[in-house]
A protein has these predicted regions:
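Alpha/beta-hydrolase-fold serine-hydrolase catalytic core, especially in secreted/extracellular enzymes
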Residues: 1-125, 280, 300, 306-375
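Cap/lid segment of the alpha/beta-hydrolase catalytic domain
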Residues: 136-223, 269-272
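Alpha/beta-hydrolase-fold catalytic nucleophile elbow
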Residues: 183, 235, 260-261, 313, ...
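Mobile cap/lid helix-loop segments that gate and shape the active-site cleft of serine hydrolases
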Residues: 209, 256-301, 307, 320-330, ...
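Conserved hydrolase catalytic core segment
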Residues: 249-255
């Protein structure tokens, strides 16, 4: 029967029809991307606090700041929706921590231990704890959780030879901060993507595992006598920067967050067919999340971090995005903080480098909001 299905239309080219159909679908998707900023505003910010909606034309030098109480109360609804609808959750209860550790490195300034914690049956969290030496008895220090990027390991944040990380976890420990470098699952192409795809079938993602690991890590850190449990900050590069907007948005226990080498106009990063650094042109097929483009981009995730301090580190030569996209998305973050009179609690640093920890404005941001460790 298939042999009878011959094309007998004179001059008809099915390739032309295929191209029209494809370009029509692409045009529809790009029209949704173009309208996604407005869709996200209507979904979250303007719904949680209607006064944030732009008013009439103004020539006033200054506008009245808003009370954040209504926005903070209402935004808990979106925090829950973000975790349940975008990140995903598991029904299983977290296991007792059952911490195990071994000392693996020591310098004149600090000692480092590998630490392993139970999360779920068959699933463990692990990372590198770096304790400054000579912490006085009874002294409680702030912690900076230093998150590696894709295909990285915790030691990458310590070794000076890693140009992207520049030993930032060790450098912060030398300043007197306790640092902890967790291992995240995005290592071993493409095995972690298979895990993400399997989790999709039950409403989860790779970050369902990562968020659970961080909950266990925070619970354990707070048990340490040297740790100030109210001052645990997050600082991540690349996929660790992606973690820096997702995990603290869900877990309020992180007192501030720094996103390095990742802050983006995420919706365009995922769906733009022309941007050379976009996910349409990479092997990272786990990056699309269901309906995320009309719900949460980086500004909205930062809105879930608000009113905690939030900082962005952006290299001019970092190909994960463009300066223009980053500035566009960050402008929404600063406007949100400024609307509530808290613009001093957010910042961005552009530096003349690449996909790297710069450690200048970001370190000063940590000192400002955590205090100088040991003082």
């Amino acid at each position: 029967p298939l042999a009878l299905m011959r094309e007998e239309r004179f001059g008809f080219n099915p390739d032309d029809r295929h191209r029209r159909l494809f370009l029509g679908m692409e045009k529809q998707v790009q029209s949704l991307v173009d309208r996604s900023d407005q869709a996200r505003d209507e979904f979250f910010f303007f719904e949680a606090e209607p006064v944030l909606r732009p008013g009439s034309w103004s020539t006033e030098k200054s506008h009245e700041r808003l009370s954040p109480l209504n926005f903070l109360t209402r935004s808990e609804e979106w925090r829950t929706r973000f975790e349940e609808e975008i990140i995903g959750t598991f029904d299983e209860e977290l296991l007792p921590l059952n911490p195990r550790s071994r000392k693996i490195r020591e310098t004149d300034a600090w000692t480092a231990w590998d630490v392993v914690l139970d999360v779920y049956p068959g699933f463990e969290a692990w990372g590198l704890l770096i304790l400054p030496k000579n912490i006085p008895a009874g002294d409680k220090r702030p912690v900076v959780v230093c998150q590696h990027g894709r295909n990285g390991v915790p030691l990458d944040t310590v070794d000076e030879g890693k140009s992207a990380y520049n030993g930032f976890a060790a450098r912060l420990a030398e300043e007197g901060f306790i640092t902890f470098a967790p291992h995240n699952l995005y290592r071993g192409e493409d095995r972690y993507r298979w895990l993400d795809r399997k989790a999709n079938l039950i409403g989860g993602t790779l970050f369902t595992f990562i968020t659970a690991s961080h909950r266990q890590t925070l619970s354990w850190l707070k048990t340490l006598p040297e740790v100030d449990g109210k001052h645990i900050a997050f600082y991540g590069l690349s996929y660790g920067g992606e973690t820096a907007v997702r995990v603290p948005a869900v877990i309020p226990d992180y007192c501030l967050s720094i996103c390095s080498g990742d802050f983006n106009h995420w919706t365009r990063k995922v769906a733009d067919p022309d941007f050379p650094g976009g996910f349409m042109k990479s092997i990272e097929w786990e990056m699309p999340y269901w309906n995320m483009g009309s719900r949460f981009d980086y500004a909205e995730m930062a809105g879930l971090i608000f009113p905690r301090p939030f900082f962005v580190e952006r290299g001019h030569h970092d190909r994960v995005s463009t300066d223009e996209w980053v500035a566009h998305e960050y402008a929404k973050v600063r406007r949100l903080y400024a609307s509530f009179g808290m613009e001093e609690k957010t910042g961005i640093e552009f530096f003349h480098g690449g996909h790297s920890i710069n450690g200048q404005g970001s370190f000063e941001f940590l000192r400002r909001f955590l205090g100088r460790a040991g003082e």
